[in-house]
């Protein structure tokens, strides 16, 4: 599975790029826009082809889901700990963790979890420089939750990530820091046995 996470800030031609990514086989798009209001989020989602709405995952503005046939929700680590996800257990929910021990403790209510940073971040300079997560994934003993690697993954290292017992990857900086995001996505797909 290849997931793309939106940048926090709006990017020029972002929804056009998103539609093209879906047309090229993107599995899921996580919409993480913490700084936009309800109307801006509505406009953003409306610009994504409705045939792809079931592949969208909301990180906020959960109340918009019914308007757009969105059944997937992501909860930050702090929100998971505070029980925010409890009213969404009949939906598809995901979360984030930052170590394999926490991942191994997740129960089956979570479809998948991002684990990060796998490599030094592309979008957050200096973050993840000394990460051992890719090595720590070998200690995975939770088969109830899919493990999605995040952080510094690009077309040059994606194959190495898939060689390490992950169920998928999430791309952020590799896509949105590139002048040719669609080409990067295509190369990522080509560089794994997908």
Indicate where each model-derived feature is located:
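Conserved N-terminal beta1-alpha1 strand-loop-helix module at the mouth
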Residues: 1-81, 86-112, 141-147, 153-165, ...
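Charged helix-capping and loop-helix junction motifs
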Residues: 43-46, 127-136
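Generic low-polarity alpha-helical segments
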Residues: 113, 136-137
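Flexible, gly/ser-rich surface segments that form the specificity/activation loops bordering the active-site cleft
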Residues: 116
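A short acidic, helix-capping loop that chelates divalent metal ions and anchors anionic groups
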Residues: 119-125
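The catalytic core of metal-dependent phosphodiesterases that act on cyclic dinucleotides
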Residues: 172
């Amino acid at each position: 599975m290849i997931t793309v996470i939106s940048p926090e800030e709006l990017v020029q031609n972002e929804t056009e790029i998103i539609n093209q990514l879906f047309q090229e086989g993107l599995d899921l798009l996580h919409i993480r826009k913490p700084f936009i209001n309800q109307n801006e989020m509505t406009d953003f989602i409306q610009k994504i082809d409705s045939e792809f709405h079931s592949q969208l995952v909301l990180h906020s503005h959960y109340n918009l889901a019914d308007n757009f046939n969105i059944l997937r929700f992501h909860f930050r680590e702090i929100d998971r700990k505070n029980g925010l996800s409890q009213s969404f257990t009949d939906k598809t929910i995901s979360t984030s963790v930052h170590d394999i021990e926490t991942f191994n403790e997740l129960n089956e209510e979570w479809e998948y979890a991002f684990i990060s940073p796998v490599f030094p971040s592309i979008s957050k300079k200096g973050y993840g420089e000394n990460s051992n997560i890719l090595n720590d994934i070998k200690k995975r003993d939770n088969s109830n939750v899919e493990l999605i690697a995040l952080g510094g993954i690009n077309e040059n290292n994606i194959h190495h990530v898939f060689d390490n017992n992950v169920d998928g990857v999430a791309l952020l900086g590799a896509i949105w820091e590139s002048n040719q995001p669609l080409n990067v996505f295509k190369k990522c797909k080509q560089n794994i046995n997908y």
